[in-house]
Swiss-Prot record:
The keyword Transmembrane applies. Residues 1178-1368 form a propeptide. One of its GO terms (cellular component) is extracellular region. Residues 1174-1177 are annotated as: Furin-like endopeptidase recognition region. Its main location: secreted. Presynaptic neurotoxin that causes massive release of neurotransmitters from vertebrate (but not invertebrate) nerve terminals and endocrine cells via a complex mechanism involving activation of receptor(s) and toxin insertion into the plasma membrane with subsequent pore formation. Binds to neurexin-1-alpha (NRXN1) in a calcium dependent manner, adhesion G protein-coupled receptor L1 (ADGRL1, also termed latrophilin-1 and calcium-independent receptor of latrotoxin (CIRL)), and receptor-type tyrosine-protein phosphatase S (PTPRS), also termed PTP sigma. Residues 217-236 are annotated as: Helix H8 is the probable transmembrane region of the tetrameric pore inserted in the target cell membrane. This is Alpha-latrotoxin-Lg1a. ANK repeats lie at residues 469-500, 504-533, 538-568, 572-601, 605-635, 639-669, 674-704, 708-737, 741-770, 774-803, 807-837, 841-870, 874-903, 907-936, 953-981, 982-1011, 1013-1042, 1046-1075, 1079-1109, 1115-1144. Belongs to the cationic peptide 01 (latrotoxin) family. 03 (alpha-latrotoxin) subfamily. Homotetramer in membranes.
Length: 1368
């Protein structure tokens, strides 16, 4: 078997979500161990160890991942990743000019935010690409994918280059920078074109919860947009780097060129991404945000797409932040290029030669504006001035009117320019002297440097002037080692001067220690410098730097300071002793001889100096540490890794031998949480020589079990280490060892990429029939992991091919699932009876082969006589599988093999529906042509969705074609076959918002825009908020006031679903605001009753002339009454704000405040009493018949405690009498209490009572008589509907009427409930089916109410009440 390439292995392992984990650890390892005293190999080693821990996960080494070779990644891929990262870090360590620092910060911050989420999407996007088959969409998405892959590949390739190659690559004519700049152009291979095509065609807007194509395209547009943004930041990063590079080289012309490119790239991309304010054009991010908001607003998101909603919110936040970041940055640079107004005169008496000043040389000056974080380009160079006898001229220039600082640059002849100083806003004279002082201190010729220093100081040079990376003359002298200058500086300076840090936190003593200038270090210590000060990024002290460089003399001078802390830690917890490991034996010897040194000191990751010496494979250094009697050779890091573990991981054979020979060594120490020993690691990382040595050592336990009971033998099989296995067999190891999951070595070999190991283990007597914890034999695993060779080897050895695992699956099922035809043939040759054998999911081999599209396998099984109509537990069958995937040839083949064409899955979907839903027109046409086998007019009893009676396949097929937005199939059904009325396609297209289908049906098939059903297409589109469809229908003559079903209009539908934009469109197109619906409510009242605050506000504010804010419904209720009923304080405030009359009384003589008081809604009462201004009035309670007739709202019914109490009290009063009734009902799952409550609601509606007031109000005789009679008659009608004669015999309705009348007349209203419940309890023959019928009859009476003094609107309210109860 050939080894997988790194790319192939990475792809396989990424499917196990390991690749990203490794890459993330590799990316972070630089940051985590950035101050490590050695990088290169040591960081790679620690990264590998860290990844092994990640690989082990919660403690168990994942067998499948190891078998795939994923454990190699820490040493294969990590090396590539780290090399790339180190090259990148090396480049970034170059100093940035001040002008580029802020840009670099912005770019780094933004790249990390965008790239993090883009990398997370990368793997998923490949899956999306493979699954998109749509002819229109696939080419567009492919462009996004192709560009993204090219961008990633080029970006990573460039970043891995060394500095010179990196520069050459970036500056290639017509190279990657130019190509990436074209991403925002409409070129065919750009990103702009496909992204806007998707947006404009609305391909990323899902029509239904099952619109998988749209969800995939949505994923694509998000990935593409993030790539677009990444391209911008990548370009900014590269142009910033190039500008900085040439700034450091002194090529200011090149610097200006790239500085200008940097700004232009930003402005161009800013315009494309967030639009141009001048033209009001929306940018890409705005369009994408609109798409996200549209998708988020779809109601079906709650139906199983919660993770999608979470993703949408995440992306909305991300793109909003990116937009804010880009919009907030007006420019990357100052737009103005400074003019050079400098007048140069030599006024100082400083004679040449000094520093760079030599007679006959020519000097030029250029300036740059600096304003907060923005910088301009560097201006043109001044005319040259010849140097004649004098140096350090004075520059005079006008004060900048905008109060910007001016940076001054100097260049001699064609040499590298230097920054020589900064002119403050109110300064007009500048003496060019301070840079020469800095240069004098930097001069390696200390005598010349000192002489120049003295002359410049005497002429007023400033020792505090700041230059490169914030360094002063103190830093320069510390680096050059000029002790005379340093003596002068320390004599005249303040304490703060000698402790002044540069931009990275290096003080002069840091620089001296890093340069090995022991004398300067000694001088600075005596001057009182802080000897333990730390750098900013890595928190290194001067002692860290001296130790790393191996400067023994400097170390000794530092140690003479009484304040020195020899164990001071850096950012990652490394002490100077750790750094000394890199410095060598001499410096290490000097360290361990110091009093107070901790030779076993650990870093934050738990690494000791001895760990580092072994990882560095530097045994002389390790031996030096061993000379300390206190050294702990078995010290462990945070993962319980000893030095021996690292030697085994790295494959250092000689170091491993040295360690094993140490008397105190613990050869069997195990890591945590994986419990892996050095032997485990040597095998895991394929270091055979180390593993063989450890196997032969008497100190090593070769049967040691890691977490999950994985032994070295198991690992040797997983990694295919034949030589190691041979040695294990020689020493008599048990070859049937089992892991915690009962894997034997033979199981692992059967799953591995080393089939030859199966034969080797069989020759050693491995158990063929051993089972894992899931009941799988080696043969089971070989077939289910697709290992054909291993399976065939096992089959030759008289293995049991009928052995099922815990899922009832046999080797034949695994062979079928993975298309192992040769294995299936071998099994069926041995035993033909397994051809149709089912697993626990009722899957046969044929069904599994079909589900996985193994065509040859399917045909082979059918040719042998397999049952072609096999169905599993979900109803999946071969014909359904191939139809779903669009394989016409296999559909034809199965037709010819007499497959049942009407076979359906558990959702009632047959092959025809699958073809329709997935847009496979070829299969649809073929099916329609096979009339002798398939007839779409056949009644389908498997489905009932959207069909009130018996419907044919044709009905569901047309409905599906429209719902799933398959326009070509719709055209075929409607246009070609002429089925205009089946499933009302125009209505369905409007319901689901498929505008192109709507247009086709109206324009090409000339269907009426108002349809022929009670509900019009406009009704459906309005209710579901499909703006484009609503606008189109109206433009094409749809009647906006046409009746919808249930006596509503389109605007009513839109209002009840809170579709504000639809309401606005309808309002502008002639909707009748005075028209009342079946609830006797206008659109305005409907908005209030629907709690649609935004719509109510819009109607009041924008359509005031069309509405009457004080209008009343049939019960004389105003919007304020309704808002109180629904306890909507926000709505109440809105109505009061716009002047609604609070004094209006409803049909029961109640104001809104009365109702709030009756229902004890304290917040509303308080507001209406105290905060409603001029409309407030004193409330006077009136007693009498109005209380009895007051009709309460549904919310009050559900809130009532009185009814529940009365009902429960009554039921519990006679448990014995009701026992049989209750038991029977309970056994039949009948909601008796709910039924009684429903009847109670019915009766209270008839009596116009609502829930009974607690105070005993008596009613007038006439009203009480009428109400009692109405209640009794309706109660009798309901019971008579049961056609139960004993019911009529057992209930005395005259007595019922008498008791109800007495209760109402005396004001004891709550007794009505008891009277009716008592009557029901007296019916001993009432059965559960009677209760069910009772409920249905109660509901049916909503359409046949005839009671005294009950208005039509009251009946409608009553009907709505019953409807809501029924729904609940």
């Amino acid at each position: 078997n050939e080894e997988l390439t790194l790319e192939e292995k990475a792809e396989i392992c990424s499917e196990l979500e390991l690749q990203q984990k490794y890459a993330d650890i590799a990316s972070n390892i630089i940051g985590d161990l950035s101050s490590l005293p050695m990088v290169g190999k040591i960081v790679g080693t620690i990264a590998a160890a860290a990844m092994t821990v990640a690989h082990v996960g919660s403690g168990r080494l994942d067998i499948e991942q190891t078998l795939l070779g994923c454990s190699d990644l820490p040493f294969d891929q990590i090396k590539e990743i780290l090399e790339t990262r180190f090259n990148e870090v090396d480049r970034k360590l170059e100093s940035h000019s001040a002008a580029l620092e802020e840009i670099t910060k912005l770019v780094d911050k933004s790249i990390s935010a965008v790239e993090k989420t883009r990398k997370q999407m990368n793997k998923r996007f490949d899956e999306v690409m493979k699954s998109i088959q749509d002819a229109k969409v696939s080419p567009i998405v492919s462009k996004i994918n192709n560009f993204a892959k090219y961008f990633d590949a080029e970006k990573e390739r460039v970043r891995g280059l060394k500095l010179n190659d990196y520069i050459l690559k970036l500056e290639e004519p017509n190279g990657i920078l130019l190509h990436f700049k074209d991403v925002r152009t409409p070129k065919d291979d750009s990103l702009q074109s496909p992204l806007f095509s998707i947006i404009q065609e609305r391909y990323a807007i899902p029509k239904t919860v099952d619109d998988e194509l749209a969800f995939k395209v949505l994923y694509a547009i998000l990935y593409g947009t993030q790539t677009y943004v990444s391209v911008m930041f990548f370009l900014l990063e590269q142009y910033s780097f190039l500008a900085n590079h040439y700034y450091e080289k002194g090529d200011l012309e090149k610097y200006d060129e790239y500085f200008n490119n940097l700004n232009n790239v930003f402005l161009d991309f800013k315009s494309s991404l967030v639009g141009s304010g001048a033209s009001n054009n929306e940018g890409l991010i705005d369009n994408v945000l609109q798409v996200l908001m549209t998708v988020k607003s779809n109601e079906f998101l709650g139906l199983g797409k919660n993770s999608l909603e979470e993703m949408l919110n995440e992306k909305i936040n991300l793109f909003s932040k990116i937009k804010e970041e880009i919009e907030g940055k007006q420019r990357m640079t100052l737009s103005e290029t400074p003019e050079n107004f400098a007048r140069i005169s030599f006024e100082k008496d400083i004679t040449t030669p000094i520093g760079d000043w030599r007679d006959s040389r020519e000097v030029r000056y250029a300036v740059q504006y600096a304003s907060e974080t923005l910088f301009s380009k560097i201006g043109h160079w001044s005319d040259p001035v010849s140097v004649r006898a004098k140096a350090c001229p004075t520059l005079r220039m006008p004060v900048d009117q905008t109060r910007r600082n001016v940076l001054v640059f100097r260049k001699f002849d064609n040499s590298k320019p230097q920054l020589v100083g900064e002119i403050t806003p109110y300064q007009s004279n500048f003496i060019d002297i301070d840079r020469d002082l800095y240069n004098a201190a930097s001069n390696p010729d200390s005598a010349v440097g000192f002489m120049e220093f003295k002359k410049l100081i005497s002429n007023g040079a400033n020792i505090r002037a700041v230059f490169n990376q914030g360094r002063t003359v103190f830093h320069a002298a510390a680096k050059s080692g000029n002790d005379k200058i340093m003596i002068e500086l320390t004599f005249f300076s303040k304490y703060t001067d000698i402790n002044q840090p540069d931009k990275k936190g290096y003080t002069p003593i840091h620089v001296a220690a890093d340069s090995g200038n022991a004398g300067i270090v000694n001088l600075l210590i005596r001057s009182g410098i802080s000897v333990n000060s730390k750098t900013y990024n890595f928190l290194q002290t001067p002692l860290h730097l001296a130790a790393q460089r191996g400067f023994v003399a400097t170390f000794q001078r530092l140690m003479e300071s009484p304040e020195i802390n020899i164990n001071e830690r850096d950012k990652d917890g490394f002490t100077p002793l750790h750094y000394a490991v890199r410095g060598g034996e001499r410096i290490l010897e000097a360290f361990i001889n110091q009093a107070g040194i901790d030779v076993n000191v650990k870093s934050d990751k738990g690494l000791t100096p001895f760990h580092l010496a072994v990882i560095k494979n530097d045994w002389p250094v390790a031996s030096t540490l061993l000379r300390s009697k206190k050294i702990d050779i078995n010290a462990i890091d945070e993962n319980n890794m000893t030095a021996l573990h690292y030697a085994a991981i790295l494959g250092f054979l000689e170091t491993t031998k040295q360690l094993i020979n140490l008397k105190e060594i613990n050869a069997n120490a195990v890591s945590s949480p994986g419990l892996l020993s050095a032997l485990h690691y040597a095998i895991l990382y394929k270091h055979d020589d180390v593993a063989l040595f450890l196997l032969k050592s008497s100190k090593v336990n070769y049967n040691l079990k890691a977490f999950g009971d994985i032994t070295p033998l198991h690992l040797a099989v997983m990694q295919g280490r034949k030589q190691v296995l041979s040695e294990m067999f020689n020493i008599g190891i048990n070859i049937n060892q089992k892991t915690a999951e009962k894997y034997t070595p033979l199981h692992l070999a059967a799953m591995s990429k080393y089939p030859e190991l199966v034969e080797i283990l069989l020759d050693q007597g491995s158990n063929l029939e051993a089972k894992t914890i899931t009941g799988a034999t080696p043969l089971n695993l070989a077939t289910f992991k697709g290992k054909s060779q291993a399976a065939l080897i096992l089959l030759k050895d008289e293995v049991n091919w009928r052995e099922p695992d815990e899922n009832g699956q046999m080797p034949i099922h695994g062979a079928a699932m993975n298309g192992l035809l040769d294995v299936a043939q071998a099994i069926l040759y041995l035993d033909a009876t397994v051809l149709d054998i089912e697993d626990k999911n009722l899957d046969t081999p044929l069904n599994l082969a079909a589900q996985n599209s193994h065509i040859d396998m399917v045909k082979y099984f059918i040719d042998l006589g397999a049952k072609v109509n096999t169905r599993n537990k979900k109803g999946q069958a071969p014909l359904l599988a191939f139809s779903k995937k669009g394989n016409l040839d296999m559909v034809k083949y199965l037709f010819d093999k007499n497959a049942n064409v009407y076979i359906a899955d558990n959702d009632g979907l047959n092959f025809f529906y699958y073809a329709v839903r997935n847009g496979h027109l070829n299969i649809v046409k073929y099916a329609m042509s096979e009339k002798d086998k398939f007839e779409w007019s056949t009644t389908d009893n498997n489905r009932s969705d959207g069909c009130s009676g018996e419907c044919a396949i044709s009905h569901f097929a047309v409905c599906d074609a429209v719902q799933y937005d398959k326009i070509e199939i719709v055209k075929y059904f409607v246009g070609t076959l002429g089925h205009y009325s089946i499933c009302s396609p125009l209505h369905q297209a409007a319901r689901y918002g498929h505008i192109h289908i709507v247009k086709y049906l109206v324009e090409e098939e000339v269907l009426s825009v108002d349809g022929s059903k009670p509900d019009t297409p406009l009704c459906y589109a309005s209710e579901n908020g499909h703006l484009a469809v609503v606008q189109y229908l109206i433009r094409n003559g749809a009647k906006v006031n046409h009746d919808c079903a249930n006596g509503m209009t389109a605007i009513d539908k839109a209002i009840t679903k809170n579709q504000l934009q639809v309401v606005q469109i309808l309002a502008e197109n002639g909707v009748d605001f005075r028209r009342k619906n079946r609830l006797d409510a206008t659109p305005f009242l409907t908005a209030v009753a629907s709690n649609s605050y935004e719509i109510a506000e819009y109607l009041i504010r924008e359509k005031r002339q069309n509405i009457n804010i004080n209008e009343q419904n049939g019960n004389k209720e105003t919007a304020l009454h309704l808002a109180v009923y629904y306890k909507n304080l926000q709505m109440i405030k809105l109505l009061v704000k716009y002047g609604i009359d609070e004094n209006i009384r409803n049909g029961y003589d109640k104001t809104a405040l009365d109702i709030a008081r009756d229902n004890k809604i304290s917040s509303i009462v308080e507001y209406l009493q105290t905060k409603s201004g001029k409309f407030r009035r004193e409330y006077k309670s009136s007693n009498g018949e109005h209380d009895l007739l007051h009709e309460n709202r549904i919310s009050n019914f559900t809130d009532s405690k009185n009814l529940e109490y009365q009902h429960q009290h009554f039921i519990n009063a006679d448990n014995d009498a009701s026992q049989s009734f209750s038991n029977t009902a309970a056994n039949q799952n009948i909601d008796v209490i709910g039924t009684l409550l429903l009847i109670d609601v019915l009766i209270r509606r008839f009596s116009k009572q609502g829930y009974i007031n607690n105070k005993p109000d008596s009613a007038s005789d006439g009203i009480a008589q009428a109400a009692a009679l109405a209640i009794t008659e309706k109660f009798e009608d309901i019971l008579n509907s049961l056609h139960n004669k004993s019911t009529e015999e057992q209930v005395d309705f005259a007595e019922v009427h008498r008791k109800i009348y007495a209760a109402l007349r005396s004001g004891r209203n709550s007794q009505v409930h008891q009277v009716l419940c008592s009557s029901l309890k007296s019916i001993s023959t009432l059965k559960p089916e009677d209760i069910k019928k009772l409920v249905s009859v109660v509901l049916s009476f909503q359409s046949s109410i005839s009671l005294p003094e009950v208005s039509a609107s009251a009946r409608e309210v009553y009907g709505e009440t019953l409807h809501l109860f029924h729904e609940s």
